């Protein structure tokens, strides 16, 4: 059991929750940095985490939140301010002399350079943030996951699956090795629990399978017991829909780029990095659907099952 404190930023995010839970179960002290006090923060506090509220764009608040911590897990949702936030956290970590800085990046970065980039401003900022961290001299571990099941199907696709039995995405026949946010969180926890062997290393994290969206639809069908179909949405219609719902411009450009990269088969990659770090295989597509079946099940069907029991 470690008496040192580990700081986890983005405490309300999909990876951070599992990271915090795992570390607490192992007896580590965890400080969760959140943007505001809400139900998610209450849950983390009930689990045993220390809660601190700080804006990552406020370097003074970030440094105060990090005071007394031996390691940092930096994770942040998609934001036009990502590079500034990551720099603030890195500057504070350098000033305070943390012994490990675990950075949650993106797998696309492994195919980027100053001459090879993408159209996504988010991916560009991830690449720049990694350059900054390398120059910083901090003891960094780089986690680069592929796309998440959670964002693909819970945030974007759940309504279409639940109400219309369809997955609508502009990926054509491109394959993607989706990973669960909880698995990424487990990988981060494994590194934070014993960071020394991992300092300076890069881990590209993929899921168990690399499948087309039509094949993912088959996985949904098998678990849910009804036919789920994949509809390949033309890119221009996809872009129009994104703008119609008035998503932030930064996010729209990122999603458009992800669509193109999937059509180009850039997400068809497999590694065993997760197995190396955690000691088990990442969860399958079918297992992800089972764990979140309620999100993909029509309300009437859920009610009838509850009544029958």
Specify the residue positions occupied by each region the protein language model found.
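Oxidoreductase cofactor-interface core, primarily capturing Rossmann-like NAD(P)-dependent enzymes
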Residues: 2-43, 57-60, 64-69, 78-87, ...
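Residues lining the SAM
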Residues: 9, 75, 279
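Short, conserved active-site loop motifs that form the nucleotide-linked donor/cofactor pocket
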Residues: 48-50, 140
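Cofactor-binding loops of NAD(P)H-dependent oxidoreductases
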Residues: 54
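Hydrophobic acceptor-binding patch used for acceptor engagement in glycosyltransferases
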Residues: 72
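Structural motif detector for alpha-helix initiation sites
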Residues: 181, 213, 235, 284-285
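A hydrophobic C-terminal alpha-helical subdomain
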Residues: 198, 236-309
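Contiguous C-terminal substrate-recognition/catalytic subdomains in enzyme active sites
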Residues: 227-231, 299-300
């Amino acid at each position: 059991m470690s008496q040192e404190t580990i700081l986890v930023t983005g405490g309300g995010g999909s990876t951070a929750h599992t990271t915090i839970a795992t570390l607490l179960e192992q007896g580590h002290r965890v400080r969760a940095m959140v943007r505001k006090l809400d139900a998610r923060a209450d849950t983390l506090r009930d689990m045993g985490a220390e809660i601190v509220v700080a804006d990552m764009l406020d370097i003074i608040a970030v440094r105060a939140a990090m005071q007394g911590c031996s390691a940092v897990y930096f994770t942040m949702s998609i934001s036009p301010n990502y590079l500034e936030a990551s720099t603030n956290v890195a500057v504070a970590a350098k000033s305070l002399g943390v012994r490990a800085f675990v950075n949650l990046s993106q797998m696309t970065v492994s195919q980027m350079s100053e001459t090879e980039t993408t159209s996504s401003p988010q991916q560009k900022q991830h690449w720049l943030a990694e350059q900054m961290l390398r120059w910083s001299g901090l003891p960094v571990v780089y986690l680069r996951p592929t796309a998440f099941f959670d964002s693909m199907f819970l945030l974007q696709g759940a309504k279409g699956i639940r109400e219309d039995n369809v997955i609508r995405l502009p990926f054509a026949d491109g394959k993607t090795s989706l990973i669960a946010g909880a698995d990424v969180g487990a990988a981060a926890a494994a590194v934070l629990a014993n960071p020394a062997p991992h300092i300076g290393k890069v881990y590209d994290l993929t899921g168990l399978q690399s499948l087309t969206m039509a094949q993912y639809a088959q996985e949904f069908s098998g678990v849910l017991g009804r036919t789920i179909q994949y509809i390949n949405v033309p890119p221009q219609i996809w872009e129009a829909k994104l703008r119609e719902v008035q998503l932030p411009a930064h996010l729209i450009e990122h999603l458009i780029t992800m669509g193109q990269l999937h059509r180009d088969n850039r997400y068809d990659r497999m590694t065993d990095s997760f197995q190396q770090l955690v000691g088990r295989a990442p969860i399958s597509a079918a297992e992800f659907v089972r764990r979140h079946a309620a999100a993909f099940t029509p309300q009437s069907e859920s009610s009838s099952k509850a009544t029958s029991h």
